[in-house]
Each structure stands twice: as C-alpha cells, then as structure tokens.
Amino acid sequence: MQKLTILLLVAAVLMSTQALNQEQHQRAKINLLSKRKPPAERWWRWGGCMLWFGRCTKDSECCSNSCDRTYCELARFPSDW
C-alpha cells in the first residue's frame, strides 16, 4: 500500500511539472507573437523609417525625408516644382 501511495505521489508531481512547463511555453509563445509587427508594417519599415509609399505625417518619418502628409514619396521633389 505504501508503494502505491508513493507511486501516485510521484505521478502527481510529474504531471504537475509537465503542466507547468507547458503553461510557461505557451506564455512565452504568446509573448513572442504579440511583439511581432503586422506583415505590412514589417515590409514598409526599414531602419526606423518608412520606405516609399508608407504612411506618414511628417518628413522625418520617411527614409526619403519626403512626406506628402499621407504617404512617403520616393524622393524629395525640387522646390521649384
């Protein structure tokens, strides 16, 4: 009877350890996925600035340093245009 009790206790400890490990793995996976940027944002952002045709509100947000208040332009147009 004592051997059966010890066996049941060991089984319970092993099962609870496995459940705890799975929970921590799931939590780590959720944290990793929540830190990812949406695919479109990853594609348009490069080095902290927006590439051509990315959304912007000011020139400094664009790699080309040229924002038309909506999207980044490919290059800055000459001022006489």
UniProtKB/Swiss-Prot annotation:
Q: Name one GO molecular function term.
A: toxin activity
Task: Report if keyword Disulfide bond is assigned.
Answer: yes
**Residues of the signal sequence?**
1-19
**Compartment list:** Secreted
GO CC entries: extracellular region
Secreted found in the keyword field: yes
Keyword entries, A-Z: Disulfide bond, Ion channel impairing toxin, Knottin, Neurotoxin, Secreted, Signal, Toxin
Residue ranges annotated as propeptide in the record: 20-42
Cystine connections: C49-C63, C56-C67, C62-C72
Q: In which tissues is it expressed?
A: Expressed by the venom duct.
Q: What does this protein do?
A: Gamma-conotoxins may act on voltage-gated non-specific cation pacemaker channels (HCN).
Entry domain remark? The presence of a 'disulfide through disulfide knot' structurally defines this protein as a knottin. The cysteine framework is VI/VII (C-C-CC-C-C).
UniProt lists the family membership as follows: Belongs to the conotoxin O2 superfamily.
Query: What's this protein's name?
Result: Gamma-conotoxin-like TeA53
Q: Which organism is it from?
A: Conus textile
